[in-house]
Structure formats: C-alpha cells, structure tokens
C-alpha cells in the first residue's frame, strides 16, 4: 500500500473540497460574513445572477439553519467530508465489484479512458438507480456530461442508502446543493482519486479507508495542536482531529487474537484455530494452583452468538474489522454455515462507538465491506449494525418530550435519556449511562411511527426529533449501558492540559485515578464496560506503567484484574509519528484476579520502527515471564516486568531510600529571565559564595547567590553555572510566585544533587554549601558529609540506576522515583572505600575547574602543566597524559564501586561492574578544543579578566587595578581591534603573539605559532599568523558565544559582512565613554588607513607594474572600498549610540544589556521610516 500517494490525495482532496463547497455556498449568496436575500419567483429564485429551482430554496433554508445552529466553517467542513466519504466508499466498491449495478461510477474498466463507465451505461442501469430517462436524455442532448454525472452520482448514493443508510443518508438536503462542480475535470477530486492511488491498493484492503480518513484530517490535527501551544483548549468539535491515530495492523491482530481469540480458546481449545492466529501468545507454564484457578473460570457454555465485542473509540473501524475476521474463524469451527456467519457477526457480536460522525460512517462502511467480502448476498436486505456516532440531546423542546412520554412512559426515564446525552460529544463513550426500560420506550416509538403514517399534525412538527433523534439516543444508550465479553480500543491520547473545563471536571469526578489523560480514563471505562471474567485490550501510552501520577491506576488494575500479556512498544510504533512523542504499550487484561499468574511481557522498546518491532515479536525475542502481582511489592507499583527475580526481592525485602532520607525538589522562580543569571554575567563583588542560611544571606545585603539548576549528565562534581537573585526583595517576590520556595529550610545546606531531566544515566554530584537548589536540580542531605558521600556513590552506581530504570524508565529522575530505590545497609562496607569516593570527587572537580566557565577556574591547563617546557606541543602531551590517567582512574574507581554494590545486592548474575567510556563525565585532551580555550584565556588576560600574576578571576566588576598585570599588561582602554591586516600595533593578533612569547619564550615563538595554527586547521596557502588572524576574524566570537551559552562577556563591535571593522570590549569594563572611544580612536583611524591603502593601490594601477600586480591591486582596492563604505555606514550607527551615552547594569545580565545596542533606529529624515541597525554582532 503506497501510503505516500494516499496521504497526498487525502490532504489535497480536503482543501479542494472545502474550496469547491465554499464556492457553491457563495453562488447561493452565503459566505462566512454575510447571507444575501434571494429574489424569489413562482418557479424558483435568483441570487448572484444565477437562477435556482423552487425546491432548492427549501434546501438553502436548511443550509442557513444549519449554519446558524453550528457555524459556517463547521458546516462547510462537514459537507466536504460527507462527499469525501461517499467518493472513497464508491471507489472501494467499484474496484472490488461490490456495486449492485456492476457498473463503475467514478472510473472506467477501459484503460486510458477518463469518462466513467456509468455515463455510457446510463440507460442500462436507469431502472436500478431510479433514474428519470427524460432528464437523462435532455442532459445527453445538451451535452451536459458533468450535470449528468452529478445526477447519476446522487441517485447512486441514494440507492446505496437503502442498503447502507448510515453511510449514504438520502441526499435531498443542502449536501446536494453544495455538491462541487467540475467533478470529472482534470485535477478534480474524482479524477485524482482514480489516478493518484493505485487500483491494487483498494482490492480487498478495507483498511485503506482508515488511512484515507487519518490523512484527510491530518492538517486539521496540526491546526488543533498549534492552537494548543497557544493555550487554546481542545473543543468538542476538534477532539476527533486531535485524537485519531490509526493502529498498525499487526498490533490490532495482537490485541484481538489475545482477547477475543483467548476468550474462545480458553473454553474451546482448538489447535487449527490457534494456528490461524499468528499473533496469539500461548499461555506460559503455570503452577498447579494457578492452573486450577484457570480451569474454574472456563465458560464451556459460551457459543459464538453469545460473544459481544465493543470498541468504544472505534474511529474508522480498524479493530472491529479484524475482530470480524476472528469471529468468522470462531463461527466456522463451531460448524455454522458460511452464508449466515457475516449477518450474525454484524447483528449479534460487534459493537462500536465514536464521537466523530464521519469516522463512525467509515467504520460502518468498513464492516459492511468486510461482510460483503465473505457473502456476496449481504446487500439483499438492510442490516442494523450496532455501531453509532454518539449524538447530543441538546435543544429537544419540552413539548416534544411531553408528546413522546404520552400516557404510557415513565417521565423520569425519558428525562434521564435526554439529560444524560446533553453535550455528549464533549465526553463520548466515557459517559456513565444507566440501563432504563428500553422495551417500553421502543414500543412507544412504534406507536409514533404509526401516527406519522396518518399525518398526526403534532408529531409532524417534531418529526426530526421523534423519528430520528430519539431513536439515535435509544440506540447509543443501549450500547453504552451494556457490558461486553471483550472491550478493546486505541483510545484518544489527550493530557488534562489540553482538555476544556467541562471534560476535565467530568474526568476528575468520575475517573479520578485516570484524570491525567484521556487514555487512562478510557482504561477505566473499558474496565467498567467489561463483564466479569471478560477481556480488555488497549494500546495506549506507556506512561501509566511508570509515572507517579498513575500510581493509583496501576494499583487498581494489579489488584482487580490479571495482566494476561503485554507488548511494551516504546517509540516508533506509529510510522506517521516521528521521535519520542508517543511511547506505547499494548496489553490484555482479564477482569478477574488469578493469583500468581505467569504473564508474558514482550519488550520491543529497543527496536526503531513498527516493522522491526513486529519481526521481533514474531521471532519470539525479548520475552519475560513474570507474575504481575509481584509489582504490588514494588514502590509505586511500577510495571517493572524486566526486573530480575533478585531485583524484585530487593524491592520487597528492603526499606526504600525515602524511608531513611528526604530528597527534595527545589524552587521554580516562575520568571527565570528576571531571577537567574549565568555566574559570569554579573559583578563578582555582588555575589555571596558562602551564605549559611536565608537570614545570613539577607544580612549580607548581597543580591546574587549560587543556584543549582540541574543541567546535563554529570557525576561527582560540576554543573555549577547559575546564580539566583535572593536578596530580601527577591525573596518576598519568590515566596508568592513560581512554586513559592518549597523546602526553604534546606537552602544553602551542603548535600548531594542530580538533574531531574537528563539524556543519559542518573548523575549525582556534590551540592556545595551556600547554594540554593532548583526544581531541576534535586537535593538530598544525609545530615553529614560521610553519609552524603556514601549515598552519592550508591546513586552513581549501575545498581541504583537499574532499580531506578524499573521505577521510571524515562529521562526524568523525579524526587519521588529516587525515594523508591531499595536501600540496603552498606555504610560499614564503604568505610574502607572512602578514598575511592573522594578520589572520584576530586578528579571530577579538577576537570570541571580546568575550564574558564567554572567559578573555581585558577589557570589554564596549558600553563598549569607547563613545567619548564617552552613548547606548546610538549605541554599538550603532558596535559593529554594527565587527563588520560585521570579518566582511567575515575573509570576504575567507578567500576570498583559498582562491584561493591553488585555484591551487596547479590546481583552478580544480573549486572557487571563495567562502565562505558561515554559515561565517564570528565574530558580527555583535545588538541583543537584545548588550543581554542588557550586562545580564549589569552583574550581574557588581554582584557583584564585574568592575569598571569594572579590565580583565578582577577577582574569582573569593582575597581580596575592595572598593577595586577605586570608580566603581561591588560589593555588600557578595554578595546582590542580585530582586522584582516596589521593596521594597529596592538591589534588582537599582535597581542596574542606577545602573550605566546611571554608565556613560553621568544626562542620557540614560531614553533608554537605553527602548532597553534595547525590546531586551527591552517590552510595550505596560509602562514601561521594569517591562520590565527582568520580565526580571530571569523570564528573566535562564535566559539566564545557557544562557550558562554549565548551570554558573551566579550562583546564584538561589528560593521558587517565585509569585516570592515571589528573590536572586542570586555563587558565588565564597559563605561558610557566606551562607544565614543571605539569610534574616534579606532573606527576613524581605520577609515583613514583604508583611504591611504586605496590611494596606494591607485598609484600602483597607474604605474607600469606587471599585469599580474595590477590585477591583484585592483581586487584589493575593490575589497578596501567595500570595507571603507561599510565603515562609513557603521559610523552613523556608532555615532548615534555614542551620543546616547548608554549605561549598563550588570545585574540585568547579558541578554538585556546587549539588546540596548541592537536594532538601533537611525533617523532618515522627515517622512521616512527609521533604519534599524546593530552595533554589535548578533548572538
């Protein structure tokens, strides 16, 4: 099946149909903004200069009434999909030769012929379709093929409506009026339907109907989710588009065979039947007492006609269609005749509900087509199927209710029937509906129908309500108040955040355990729909298996039912959904408790797509047999089926971490832009690194404090990057917003921490005293340093992680999950290994502090490991050896700690102590990275952030003291130009060369510059100095922005793409005169140098120099002219800003301060729009 072609057709058909239906409405004087009054005549009416017949006026009135009842857009959408459904249904029937006339309506059997066969065969089928031959002949004589086709199409739909009334309602209303024109033209929906989808894809594959529907609504679905991101809740009209997801066929087969199939085989074992169901899972070997329980539960009296199967969210009927196939097998082996089976299945076995009218139509049609595939005579009389789209009772007047009740009915029951279905499309099949006296109500319906035949005036007034609406309510109430042997579905996935208030309140009131998501609500509803001893099968989101918010639902199902089987699918099950968005599981439950039942769980999460998962299932890979009631011993009742027996024992026999310690989640500011800064952004004298408590912090009168915000995966030490504003003013504000400062008694305490969200393993590290923790940086204190270290060692082990993975196998390590890790006594065993733990911490700290983005940075590794060497290449080798040794030592330490914990927990058969290299968090030497960081350190020394005469951070606010820079002078004016040639003696390249000379030596200068250039990927035609200049000109600032997480501290003045002018300024040394100084001392100087260089090229061009020299001079002149022009234009920008004398406040952070110099509006004269320009390079 070519799903790309199917999707392309469906998506384009929706837009074409909507546009065409809108055009037809326009011709009738109806648009979204107005409804015109028609000019009426005796035999018709005219509007927009077009004449219509009198009966069309009544149709137009019904259309207007519908628009007023709903709205214009919804009615246009409904008419469009009605015709879409009819077109695809007729196409399916004609290709499979199911049309009663045997003549194709939309296409021709003759290859290459565009005109449908029905046009040429019209007189032969006139009687079958009740065609008026006078109309046919007139249209033929007038050569109106399009009109003839529309006439035949409408008659064909009406005729099909006699055998499939739910799919083809009689066309005599506004849908006929809005039937699009030009249906046979090139590019029309009908022509595209025939040409774009291969005929083979229609043959005996009724699932194509479901795919067409899903793709048809895909754009609408995208619109709904785009609105959801804008906090627009999902309305009842949009619930179908938001929640429809077509289930892969093999998963449907698993669900049906292991619920419906199992129901039959448990009491009627049959090897032949079982062999036909290749997704049926044979029962695992059970203990004798379990087998005894199972024997007692068998229902040997069950006959095929007794079985009832419900899909409460049937969509386009995919699951019910396969249930039909399985039921057919059951009937066959029970000895029924093949001719009678399809009708029995439709009328006795299958039930379906949905809130989407169009999907329900297609489900009905799919079942009829499935029945037709088994019995060619199935269309000989209308069948009443037990499927329906849930209808609302809104708007039924009291007079109609009174009339319906009459003298014979219980008014309370009819009132209940009406009331329970008010706004029912809001809730769908989750509505709790009671059984009432349907026999008496249906008897009254017959009386009213007989009165209708004698034209009772009162009943005529409410004929639509009495003869159409109330029967629909009765039908759906009967289905929804019954219980079934098998209930199976792919429920809608909709989190409570997307629900509107009405739906959210209903879910909270009636399905509290599952209120977080509609799929969980449907799990509970399916359970309610099921008979005792019956089966429930769903495919839904795996989150219910693990997340703490579904703890109650897990406990409920583990206590009240038996998991018969499960395929844990993970992501990639639905081929049309990419990434990790939908992570699924499919399962079968028995609504009866069978203690110690051994359940097969199949783990398919590691396979990438649905096809791979299917093959693994069939090859019987990744199977785990577990008694699911053991999960009741797991804290939180997680479905930890892939835990080994010893792991499950550890859960059941030990205390959990939360029994002994109290891990906490920290604060959420509610406004990070206001309260959080990266530590390098602010004035260092306004940071308090050592507060002991909240009162101590406030007494210091200092604003900024270290803040633990989680961060990427890292163990032992690190991720110290943020500060939080926590003075008294900020504290008072934070106490009232965000999450209102939870666990504040623990702020500034030492302990351990981990990131709540990560892309890897759990990484636990030190939480330094003086730090406040965030909701993303969870916190735990054991009360003393020794126990903190022990806990950190355990939580960083693969033992702790394997337990945590069973508790919650997502990338979120919530406090509640960590609380549930089983904790054995191991402190005494670790006493002798304390040196291993402290070694891990010190190695990780040394690594973290070797990079200038750490507030513990002292000196660059190229200088720390210099010893007496004067060659950078040798120093890099020393550093590389040291980093490798540290890496290997940390790896050995972690593996030894793993070995200890594996032994403590007796998991030698389940785990090995090895740690993958990718999971060791410290960095090995990297020539390019380390040389670039050496260059960054050099720039820091040039601008005064660092000094060769003093360790650590020397200046980041306060008074600048030039006496701290003796060995290598910091730039006096805080401005370092970056140019593409040596225009300034103190440009950045000259200063860097001087830095290399000072830190290493004059003798090895050229060798060291060559080594640096090599690390920067020097080009073949470059000198080392040219390579270094190119790096500063093109890449240094990009690397700086990346290193400082888009919060650069060295700001780049940048004239534009021609590199006319660039200069670096250190943010912490900026003052109101800096911009003016850049302009007068550097930009203007450079402009004069460009002018001089251009003049020099002019002299050469007028001389008798060689052609080669002149060509080069001309090229250089053109470049210089572009740079000069760019500088002149930039001068306007810099002059405008210099005059403003902008001040910055470091407390505001880089983002706010940088923006003051961007998007500057330059006046362009009266009546002209100001020109926007940037002073600084974009970040």
UniProtKB/Swiss-Prot annotation:
UniProt key word Transferase: yes
GO process annotations (BP): defense response to virus; DNA modification; methylation
Disruption phenotype annotation: No visible phenotype during normal growth, BREX no longer confers phage resistance.
Keyword Isomerase: no
Gene: pglX
InterPro entries: BREX_1_PglX, DNA_methylase_N6_adenine_CS, MethylTrfase_TaqI-like_dom, N4_N6_ade-DNA_methylase, SAM-dependent_MTases_sf
Inducing stimuli: Part of the brxA-brxB-brxC-pglX operon.
PANTHER family, sorted: DNA METHYLTRANSFERASE A, DNA METHYLTRANSFERASE YEEA-RELATED
Pfam family, one: Eco57I
Reactions accelerated catalytically: a 2'-deoxyadenosine in DNA + S-adenosyl-L-methionine = an N(6)-methyl-2'-deoxyadenosine in DNA + S-adenosyl-L-homocysteine + H(+)
GO molecular function: nucleic acid binding; site-specific DNA-methyltransferase (adenine-specific) activity
PROSITE patterns: N6_MTASE (PS00092)
Similarity comment: Belongs to the methyltransferase superfamily. PglX adenine methyltransferase family.
Enzyme class: transferase
Keywords of the record: Antiviral defense, Methyltransferase, S-adenosyl-L-methionine, Transferase
Record EC number: 2.1.1.72
Protein name (database record): Adenine-specific methyltransferase PglX
Lineage: Bacteria, Bacillati, Bacillota, Bacilli, Bacillales
